[in-house]
Amino acid sequence: MSLTRLHIETFRNISLAQLDPGDGLNLIYGQNGSGKTSILEAIYFLGMGRSFRSHLSQRVIQHNDDKLTLFANLSVCEQESKIGLRRFRNGETEVKINGDNIKRLSTLAETLPIQVITPESFSLLFEGPKSRRQFIDWGAFHSDKSFHLAWANVRRILKQRNQLLKNQVSYSQIQYWDKELVRYSEQVTEIRKQYVDSLNEQLKGIIGEFLPLVEVKVSFTRGWDSKTDFGQLLETQYLRDVAAGNTGSGPHKADLRLRVGVLPVQDALSRGQLKLLVCALRIAQGKLLKQQTDKNSIYLVDDLPSELDAQHRKLLLQQLMDTGAQVFVTAIEPAAIVDSLATPPSKMFHVEQGCVTVIDKPTRE
């Protein structure tokens, strides 16, 4: 899977740009503020319907326009697909895949699986469980078609249950919702657990490449004690949940725990090692996606030279190339990337003040 053409219009500081990326590694370079990260952001927006830099999507639309337009040709198993997205300042979104109107943004994510490695993505290990649940759920969504609806049902029921808790209704009025919550929670949890088990198998060898002297143990916690019946737990904790006004246990509290020995990785590893661990997690996800669905992810790697030293930069780039995936990497100076590659990039693009120029014959400096 790879993007063969990308059209960007009125997105951030890019008024109009068209790129024909290569199948392998695409290097995008330019000074800070030139617009190189905006290209990665546009690809992400096309696959997810939102930005990885801001939760306010309207901010990515140029101030003198009322909409942005993104379009791409996508090659999948030698077949061409077309994806188009238009986002208006009022929040409305139009999405088309091969000319058909698409109602659900999840269809975009299914069509264009994207992995992101940016300075912000290293917060996966430092922030709360939410970001790690999202990491698990990316894989669960792609590995099992029933996950998306089951998780949507969990969130819908939790919203209803929490409102009833705030209204301090009797447990008999909540009992029906608890039965439904248990049903879908068990489905979500089983899919998540199976996914993490499969991810662990992929992860072992990759962590060995990045952190050869470190043994990292990865475990999944479901959001309640696995030895406890979830339905009974909801009833037992009812008064506590009423006092809190929300549901204290469930799949919305799940987490991915990573340890070295008995210590959390945050306490056992240096910041540089933690960055390598996040890279290993992202690569493992991409390899598992390929194994389970025969689809490659598209990797977006922002500002790589500032995050890793030359040795580990070379290792990461080699690991990315070994996945067979299409990769987009940004840097201020092209030499920082070119000198870390065994072969030249598939394509190079220079960005200056929102204008993109293709460099036809990338060479080492």
From Swiss-Prot:
Compartments, as annotated in UniProt: Cytoplasm
UniProt entry keywords in alphabetical sequence: ATP-binding, Cytoplasm, DNA damage, DNA repair, DNA replication, DNA-binding, Nucleotide-binding, SOS response
Gene Ontology terms: biological process: DNA replication; DNA synthesis involved in DNA repair; double-strand break repair; SOS response
Molecular function terms from GO: ATP binding; single-stranded DNA binding
Positions of transmembrane segments: none
Gene Ontology CC terms: cytoplasm
Keyword Signal: no
Family matches, as Pfam families: SMC_N
UniProt-listed InterPro entries: DNA-binding_RecF, DNA-binding_RecF_CS, P-loop_NTPase, RecF/RecN/SMC_N, RecF_2
Binding site for ATP: G30, Q31, N32, G33, S34, G35, K36, T37
Family: Belongs to the RecF family.
Protein function: The RecF protein is involved in DNA metabolism; it is required for DNA replication and normal SOS inducibility. RecF binds preferentially to single-stranded, linear DNA. It also seems to bind ATP.
HAMAP family: RecF (MF_00365)
Protein name: DNA replication and repair protein RecF
UniProt source species: Shewanella halifaxensis (strain HAW-EB4)
